[in-house]
Curated annotation (Swiss-Prot):
Name of the featured protein: Stilbene synthase 6
GO cellular component: cytoplasm
Subcellular location: Cytoplasm
Positions in coiled-coil regions: none
Listed pathway(s): Phytoalexin biosynthesis; 3,4',5-trihydroxystilbene biosynthesis; 3,4',5-trihydroxystilbene from trans-4-coumarate: step 2/2
Pfam family of the protein (one): Chal_sti_synt_N
Superkingdom in the source lineage: Eukaryota
Family, similarity comment: Belongs to the thiolase-like superfamily. Chalcone/stilbene synthases family.
The protein's role, per its UniProt record: Mediates resistance to pathogens which are sensitive to stilbenes.
Organism the protein comes from: Vitis vinifera
Keyword Transferase annotated: yes
Catalytic activity of the protein: 4-coumaroyl-CoA + 3 malonyl-CoA + 3 H(+) = trans-resveratrol + 4 CO2 + 4 CoA
InterPro entries recorded: Chalcone/stilbene_synt_C, Chalcone/stilbene_synt_N, Chalcone/stilbene_synthase_AS, Polyketide_synthase_type-III, Thiolase-like
Molecular function via GO: trihydroxystilbene synthase activity
């Protein structure tokens, strides 16, 4: 008879969790930042607020965003005007839209990841789903499992209302699942739509205005597993370690409250400073065991909370400008998609590496870091190891 220790050891994988495929998706409706102030003040019936519109236009100009994809259309706002009003009761209709669209958008990204992976979906043993958009029972994970036709025995983890750091959280969770369940293949999906936070402008809520200028809709998916079969699977990045911490006395720095009016968003002006002043401690704790202290020797996947955060991190760590190129590209093309962002950036990183004929999926470098920042103020740190690129 096997001992408990032998039984437990037999359940564990031998190697590190590895990302095996990536997929991303957005809604069809695209808005351009150059004329978004005109659009936003028109659809929210706020064109009389001329000075606030000028202020909002300046925020948009400084955002470094070219375009975003947003599920809400002008026609939908005409049909449901309370969504576009400032602080009008609207949670019911928001929830009705969200609970249908979040799983659907997640499905689109998941199908792309599954297609790239190339294996039968019956091999998916675990599903980790994350969204800040809406809550229901059974959750978006259950709906997605049914939309994809996953096995009824798939083991599901549903993460609600984690916010922008959760792209790191889902990878940390998937790593634990893959490494502690031999043969596991974990489908990870982040799906975010701004229906939950969209509302009209107010002079008394400038932090809400910042959110209206930054956030976009998108979904991303990865498949994670240990001990990949390289004859049929293509490893992209290894998840070497993962950690989470929160900055003391910063609970209100980034915050959201789900109320009758939807999800309200609150932001302290010193968030870029809080993050940049604490990020090196996270790097040191993560990379000291590997003997790495040169942050420019890493490839970087950082949640693009906004240009001010990226600029502050870049300056504090003396990073070369090219280090955050992939992050800035995703911010420019999609805006801040909350939890979905870092997986978009991973996708951009590996595509850029292959296109540039780099030696590894990490722009030719071996080691990298993935950061998520969000409410708490919480920081997720994931140490990545790239994979040599294979050219046919």
């Amino acid at each position: 008879m096997a001992s408990v220790e032998e039984f437990r050891n037999a359940q564990r994988a031998k190697g590190p969790a590895t990302i095996l495929a990536i997929g991303t998706a957005t809604p069809d409706h695209c808005v351009y930042q150059s004329d978004y102030a005109d659009y936003y003040f028109r659809v929210t019936k706020s064109e009389h607020m001329t000075e606030l519109k000028k202020k909002f236009n300046r925020i948009c100009d400084k955002s470094m965003i070219k375009k975003r994809y947003i599920h809400l259309t002008e026609e939908m706002l005409e049909e449901h005007p309370n969504i576009g009003a400032y602080m009008a009761p609207s949670l019911n209709i928001r929830q009705e839209i969200i609970t249908a669209e979040v799983p659907r958008l997640g499905r689109d990204a998941a199908l792309k990841a599954l297609k790239e992976w190339g294996q039968p979906k019956s091999k998916i043993t675990h599903l980790v789903f994350c969204t800040t958009s809406g809550v229901e029972m059974p959750g978006a994970d259950y709906k997605l499992a049914n939309l994809l036709g996953l096995e009824t025995s798939v083991r599901r983890v549903m993460l609600y209302h984690q916010g922008c750091y959760a792209g790191g959280t889902v990878l940390r969770t998937a790593k634990d699942l893959a490494e502690n369940n031999a043969g596991a293949r974990v489908l990870v999906v982040c799906s975010e739509i701004t229906v939950v936070t969209f509302r009209g402008p107010s002079e008394d809520a400038l932090d809400s205005l910042v959110g209206q200028a930054l956030f976009g809709d998108g979904s991303s998916a990865v498949i994670v597993g240990s001990d990949p079969d390289v004859s049929i699977e293509r490893p992209l990045f290894q998840l070497v370690s993962a950690a989470q911490t929160f900055i003391p006395n910063s609970a209100g720095a980034i915050a959201g409250n789900l109320r009758e009016v939807g999800l309200t968003f609150h932001l302290w002006p010193n968030v870029p400073t809080l993050i940049s002043e604490n990020i090196e401690k996270c790097l040191t704790q993560a990379f000291d065991p590997l003997g790495i202290s040169d942050w420019n020797s890493l490839f970087w996947i950082a949640h693009p909370g906004g240009p001010a955060i990226l600029d502050a991190v870049e300056a504090k760590l003396n990073l070369e400008k090219k280090k955050l190129e992939a992050t800035r590209h995703v911010l420019s093309e999609y805006g801040n998609m909350s939890s979905a962002c870092v997986l978009f950036i991973l996708d951009e990183m590996r595509k850029k590496s292959l296109k540039g004929e780099n030696a590894t999926t990490g722009e030719g470098l071996d080691w990298g870091v993935l950061f998520g920042f969000g409410p708490g103020l919480t920081i997720e740190t994931v140490v990545l190891h790239s994979i040599p690129t294979v050219t046919n």
